[in-house]
Amino acid sequence: QDLPGNDNSTATLCLGHHAVPNGTLVKTITNDQIEVTNATELVQSSSTGKICNNPHRILDGINCTLIDALLGDPHCDVFQDETWDLFVERSKAFSNCYPYDVPDYASLRSLVASSGTLEFITEGFTWTGVTQNGGSNACKRGPDSGFFSRLNWLTKSGSTYPVLNVTMPNNDNFDKLYIWGVHHPSTNQEQTSLYVQASGRVTVSTRRSQQTIIPNIGSRPWVRGLSSRISIYWTIVKPGDVLVINSNGNLIAPRGYFKMRTGKSSIMRSDAPIDTCISECITPNGSIPNDKPFQNVNKITYGACPKYVKQNTLKLATGMRNVPEKQT
């Protein structure tokens, strides 16, 4: 281009972009190593190491599992009627009551976790002809023998244990969760001394379901001084339905029901400390920012979280291909 003037000077106009001394390597469909002037990391690869208590309501299980809190293990009484968005179970959690098992533990745990509440309503069950409120030295409540607070251990009265047949209708407009159990004595002598009959039976029914459990008498590994066990079961009673309990022995009866709710509550196993901070996304490793589209911290998440990927890094090129000028 000629410049105005009398000296016939010319200038050159260059179209292009600035190169940088040290570009960023990115992957493309056709090449694993392309250097560009600028790139943005898309993968969140670290956590804060702590769980933020805002905006989600975090309930720290401390020494209690969710199921122990549900049953009413004496050392978990502090959790009665609690609510949460995320229940955090710790590796140090332990049971400290009558040894038990839950045949479908994971399903019950998930059901209660998603409900987000341990709200419990006591009901007036009538248990005629039996002794109520059984306890054990394996389940101390203070200095005294105790039991799970949400369950009622029924044993013989005098020398009899009559057939029990109890009904409880659901006249409300929400689902009710009933927790009950079956006692498995360690010997035949223990069976008859508690329930008279040589073999008990427990049947729990609604219009939609029925469960019949026959106790398994026999010695098991000793736990807290006991070789007997309790198996825990549950029944959901829908509005308009009725709960029917029939038994001639070995029944661990419900004292009422847990009010079921629908929502997005959940549970997570983590030993990360809980802190006063704000984060929408929580993993077992701790909270993470959600300003990137991907994360590789943990597959398990709660809240509004980036999508999990296996890659440690994914970069988005935000600049042109970097071709520094070679000078001699």
UniProtKB/Swiss-Prot annotation:
Subcellular location: Virion membrane; Host apical cell membrane
Subunit note: Homotrimer of disulfide-linked HA1-HA2.
Function: Binds to sialic acid-containing receptors on the cell surface, bringing about the attachment of the virus particle to the cell. This attachment induces virion internalization of about two third of the virus particles through clathrin-dependent endocytosis and about one third through a clathrin- and caveolin-independent pathway. Plays a major role in the determination of host range restriction and virulence. Class I viral fusion protein.
Keywords: Clathrin- and caveolin-independent endocytosis of virus by host, Clathrin-mediated endocytosis of virus by host, Disulfide bond, Fusion of virus membrane with host endosomal membrane, Fusion of virus membrane with host membrane, Glycoprotein, Hemagglutinin, Host cell membrane, Host membrane, Host-virus interaction, Lipoprotein, Membrane, Palmitate, Transmembrane, Viral attachment to host cell, Viral envelope protein, Viral penetration into host cytoplasm, Virion, Virus endocytosis by host, Virus entry into host cell
A Gene Ontology biological process term: fusion of virus membrane with host plasma membrane
Organism: Influenza A virus (strain A/England/878/1969 H3N2)
Mode of membrane association: Single-pass type I membrane protein
Gene name linked to the record: HA
Glycosylation (residues): 8, 22, 38, 63, 165, 285
GO molecular function: host cell surface receptor binding
Protein name: Hemagglutinin
